[in-house]
Amino acid sequence: MRGNTHQIPLQETSLEIWDSKYRLKSKDGAPIDGSIDETYQRVARALAAQEREPDTWYAPFLWALRNGAIPAGRITSNAGAFEHKPATSTINCTVSGTIEDSMDDILGKVHEAGLTLKAGCGIGYDFSTLRPRGAFVSGAGAYTSGPLSFMDIYDKMCFTVSSAGGRRGAQMGTMDIRHPDVVEFIQAKREDGRLRQFNLSLLITEEFVSAVKEDAPWQLIFPYTAKEVEQDGIALDDPARLVWADWPNKEGVVINELGQVACKVYKTLPARKLWNVIMTSTYDYAEPGFILIDKVNQMNNNWFCEEIRATNPCGEQPLPPYGACLLGSVNLTTFVRDPFTEQAAFDWPAFRKVVAIFTRMLDNVVEINQLPLAKQREEITAKRRHGMGFLGLGSTLTMLRIKYGSAASVAFTEQVSQELAMTGWQESLRLAKEKGPAPIMEQEFEVTGKMLRLRPEMAADGIKLGDKVKGKVLHARYSRYMQQVAEVDPALVAELAEVGGRFTHHSSIAPTGTISLSLANNASNGIEPSFAHHYSRNVIKPGKKSKESVDVYSFELLAYRELVNPAAMPYAEEEGSRLPDYFITADDITPTGHVDIQAAAQRWIDSSISKTANVPTDFPFEQFKDIYLYASDSGLKGCTTFRFNPAAFQGVLVKEKDLENTSYEFTLEDGTVITARGNEEIEYDGELHTAANLYDALKEGYYGKF
């Protein structure tokens, strides 16, 4: 049997989401894209128009889109559509400029963020730069309310600004594990309705992980101002009052020759005590996430000109201040030949061909970025960063009869990530020769003490403090990631050091939730296994305050029913309707199995990976804590877990049995209390909702106070 999965009809939900999110329509709602293929034609035409010979490239671009290349939602929605919606961007990911510790700059960055969200982009911020609650503000002659109170302003702004194309605004807030207000940050979202427009992540350092392992004390610190040091007569060599640390604040502070900032010690506590506060919150509330920030910066290709402190809202793009990145994913299920048979195989030549063409397509998106801020446009034009990843890994493994989490699945994940990376960097060199390298490659950088501290091998190569070195040399020869690429193809990286690459970054694995469900017919999200093979998914519908629950099937189940057994269903009791044992779901995989898959991909992904390790509700807390240490030891750049806990929040993907077994209480205005099962329908404010989704919308503040 040689099954053609291209011909499996799209399920109704997939078509509905394409229609509501990606289909181009006139201002009165009349469809302009007549079909999904016409959406592909629009995108291919817009990207080919950036070439010297558009007609030459239109056909290959359209072929790639028909064969597994899926640009991210902003590109699919907006490329070729600027005549109809001129204020929208093709860029999914941005990070705010550094928020300086002044009222003027805090409110200025709110304004910039509002414009960014209005253009349809997600945005991340580092709030570690704001002095802690209770610190004295000499200019105001008063004490500050701290970063959390200012985060509330950003939250309300995001809630108010309707993000373009009917999307809810997406924000990431990060805080350094050394910040004095870190515990307040960890626990902030326990208050109903607070910071609901944010994902929250901690910037976890290697020093903190070591302190936890060694049961050592941990200092909470924040920079002194230069004025404080002078007025209070603080000795710069007094370890009791001052420590030197890498910190993003660079204005009005004291900096040493290594680029470190003089910081005040606010409090010292056992590292394990702080660790337990984090773990308790993550176990019960699935937040904050972890960003292993030292690993992010060590492996950053632009290590010589960037200090990364924040990510986009889903965490797959760590970016510098004003950084921006566009995304795209390759649907791996497209390349499975003879699925579900002993002859099942992955078509590597076809995969490499799609990746090569798609790399050129994504590079062209830089020319039509439509970012709202000049500094964002300067960043993306100078570095030409993009993040190509894949989706459908779990579905693909099932079609190849490989269990997700097994040794074979880890090996396949590493191979597919390496093939994607190597093809991308080969294309980077070809494009640089044809069109020129990214401008930053030809820029000269003065060697600083910090650069020599971070890369001692530069001194061994005879490079001295104050020397001028081109970006292409610092990128290819001294980036830790590019040296991994050199282990496979040293000639390629040597030539990149001579010519410069077309872009500084090529790969990133996004969650792909909506494009997987729509354009990939519910192939598994990103690097994930399928959540379940038949389940309810909570989707945002324009104009509705609660999410709407829709019934969906996994792509691999649809394919199996189409190609092998039309009667097959999960949990079937009849022998003739059962699925093979390699049909597994997120709950069947151990937390360490999730981490192993992520680690296999991370070696070859030059940005980061958005991934969630699903944890059973009854998973022991002591074992849960070990997942994060295991993730750190495995070389990950970030880690997120999800444990079903309906009292705290409602996930995007929900199993029917979980809803049936969960009760929700609602108190009416007259004091009457009603109880409803999670899947029961309730009419409220003129709309029908499931009890679970209504409870979640009320809790998040979409109807005012909870």
Model-found features: residue ranges?
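Structural signal for hydrophobic packing residues in well-ordered secondary-structure cores
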Residues: 1, 22, 43-51, 62-69, ...
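Acidic/polar, glycine-rich intrinsically disordered N-terminal extensions of enzymes
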Residues: 1-90, 238-262, 275-279, 629, ...
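Secondary-structure capping and boundary motifs in well-ordered enzyme cores
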Residues: 10, 35-36, 83-87, 99-102, ...
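Catalytic alpha/beta core of large soluble enzyme barrels
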Residues: 14, 316-318, 362-367, 437, ...
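Long, charged, mostly alpha-helical binding arms that flank functional sites
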Residues: 324-388, 398, 572-578
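Active-site cavity-forming subdomains of large catalytic enzyme subunits
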Residues: 4-8, 91-348, 371-375, 379, ...
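Glycine-rich phosphate/pyrophosphate-binding loops
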Residues: 119-131, 168-173, 400-406, 608-611, ...
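Core structural elements
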Residues: 10-19, 63-83, 177-178, 359-368, ...
